[in-house]
């Protein structure tokens, strides 16, 4: 099982209790925060990118929604050409986005991280955003 592999490799414990599963969950969460921090730091410096939600890493999960003045479709295509995969749209949150003043026709760009995302993937994303915005 995947959690057993993570536990064996990183923690050297057997997953026999909820506390050991919690340790693996904490390990995953910690890695996701490490990956997310450079992006949040970058976004803080960009006045033309609106981050939906907090810049504080402790207040976030590793999914980031941004709004820019550029067309999301165009930006997503440009990032995809750099082998950076992003999503665009409303992600079934139409009323929330409307309440936040987001143009529903444009929606948001969604950037998702998981614990096995590499640091170089994050660097490539930041470089692409910096290049195209």
What are the functions of these language-model segments?
Residues 1-133:
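Pyridoxal 5′-phosphate
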């Amino acid at each position: 099982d995947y959690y057993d592999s993570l536990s064996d490799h990183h923690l050297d414990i057997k997953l026999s209790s909820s506390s050991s599963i919690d340790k693996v969950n904490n390990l995953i969460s910690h890695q996701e925060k490490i990956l997310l921090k450079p992006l949040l730091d970058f976004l803080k410096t960009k006045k033309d990118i609106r981050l939906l939600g907090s810049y504080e890493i402790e207040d976030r999960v590793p999914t980031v929604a941004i709004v820019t003045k550029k067309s999301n479709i165009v930006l997503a295509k440009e990032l995809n050409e750099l082998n950076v995969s992003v999503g665009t749209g409303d992600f079934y949150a139409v009323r929330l986005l409307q309440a936040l003043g987001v143009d529903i026709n444009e929606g948001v760009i969604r950037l998702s991280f998981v614990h096995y995302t590499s640091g170089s993937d994050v660097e490539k994303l930041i470089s692409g955003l910096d290049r195209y915005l």
